[in-house]
A protein has these predicted regions:
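Juxtamembrane boundary at the C-terminal end of a transmembrane helix
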Residues: 2-4, 183-197
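Structural signature of hydrophobic alpha-helical transmembrane segments
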Residues: 4-19, 68-84, 136-148
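Juxtamembrane transmembrane-helix termini in multi-pass membrane transport proteins
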Residues: 8-45
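Generic transmembrane alpha-helix signature in multi-pass membrane proteins
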Residues: 23-27, 31, 90-96, 107-110, ...
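C-terminal ends of transmembrane helices
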Residues: 24-38, 86-100, 152-163
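Small-residue-rich segments of transmembrane alpha-helices in multi-pass membrane proteins
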Residues: 45-55, 105-120, 170-182
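Ordered, amphipathic secondary-structure segments that act as subunit-interaction surfaces
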Residues: 59-105
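Interfacial loop-to-transmembrane junctions
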Residues: 157-176
């Protein structure tokens, strides 16, 4: 059981990284990754929302939607739960960490529409995970999002300080760098299974 939980966690962080392998959550990945501290703040906020969303949506789906045969409402119910959680996070950040709230700007409310958050809640159910496995999966996906954001912010800060051909400045060099980071994560595909075998 512990081995399976570690595998789920490592898969979420490295192998099935939602940003770099499944291309979910690209908007904040490209928009908030200019500074490492902003990227870390966004990564922690998204991880927190993912964990809270899973903690609420899993029992809601299992004990309310399924018994009432309302599974078709899954997406809309999950979006409403995520929106409420994001509002809660925004209120907490504004009250206790106003500098981070200001630096995240418009990207903080956009966590509501971050497809990575919705994706992890839906994928946990479609993958047949129980509650503990769903929470571990959400933690892994959130940490993977955080890792990708912070690594890419570091890469991006280096790119911004280096001369690049005029045609590559801005978005083109950013997308090229993102693809190289994604290729680096692709190298983890067989590592996790071999470590736990």
């Amino acid at each position: 059981m512990l081995k399976e939980l570690v595998l789920i966690l490592m898969a979420g962080v490295l192998v099935n990284n939602y940003v770099l392998q499944q291309f979910l959550g690209i908007c904040p990945f490209l928009g908030v990754s200019k500074k490492v501290n902003q990227a870390a703040g966004m990564g922690f906020a998204v991880t927190f929302v993912m964990l809270c969303a899973t903690a609420v949506t899993y029992p809601l789906f299992t004990y309310a939607l399924v018994p009432l045969k309302l599974e078709y409402l899954q997406t809309i119910v999950f979006i409403l739960v995520i929106a409420a959680l994001v509002q809660f996070v925004e209120i907490v950040l504004k009250k206790f960490i106003p500098a981070l709230h200001k630096s995240l700007g418009v990207y903080l409310p956009l966590i509501t529409t971050n497809c990575a958050v919705l994706g992890v809640t839906i994928n946990n159910i479609t993958d047949g995970y129980n509650f503990i496995e769903s929470m571990i999966s959400s933690l892994g996906v959130g940490l993977g999002f955080l890792l990708a954001m912070v690594l890419f912010a570091g890469v991006r800060s280096r790119i911004d300080n280096c001369p690049a051909p005029k045609a590559f400045k801005g978005i083109p060099i950013t997308l090229i760098a993102a693809s190289i980071v994604a290729l680096a994560f692709y190298g983890f595909a067989g590592v996790v299974e071999n470590l736990l075998a």
